[in-house]
């Protein structure tokens, strides 16, 4: 469990650095649960082409859109599972969960992607105009 926590902290730091830039330039802002983030346990941070920031957490997704913060959780169709990866293709947002498969955002609700075999997603990457998903197949 300690190694998982260290890994989560490492990736969170790397992604924050990537998105928010050089520490010697500009203004840094730390977002916490008290600021409206779904959870302080962050698994993924993704910036889309509209400059919105999607944060995959232990308790759903938080969308940072300018000055607005929006949370997506069970009431939006997401399972109660860790959101480990967020990506998009042509404006369609996909999320990978730990143990509950992959979901796509349609009309402000997440729907499960049924063609993905295996619910335990290891990673998901957007390469060109395709999404590649690594899962553990189940019998």
Regions found by a protein language model. Name each.
Residues 1-139:
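Carboxylate-rich, polar loop motifs that coordinate divalent cations or form catalytic acidic clusters
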